[in-house]
């Protein structure tokens, strides 16, 4: 299935607090200790700002998709249509609707396990 990107995505630039060169397509959040900076989500209770689209080193510009359709890294198997949350490594996992942790988007493709890249709608 092809997905058309019509320019409706919301993409921002922040500063990578740490080396995020190995974190492309993982979920990032605001670094509360540093203005205009991001870190990889590190807990299932974190509220993601968006998906890291590039591979910045520490102090470099981090391109973050806050809303739209994008690739994301999985932390476990994910079914097409599943609601998505974050795991303790910044990757997406299936999030049950009744769960108190934040729902971040919906899977548009399927993952067989951790470490795969899928397409998701992020909101």
Where does each model-flagged region fall?
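Surface-exposed, low-hydrophobicity beta-strand/loop segments enriched in small/polar/acidic residues
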Residues: 1-123
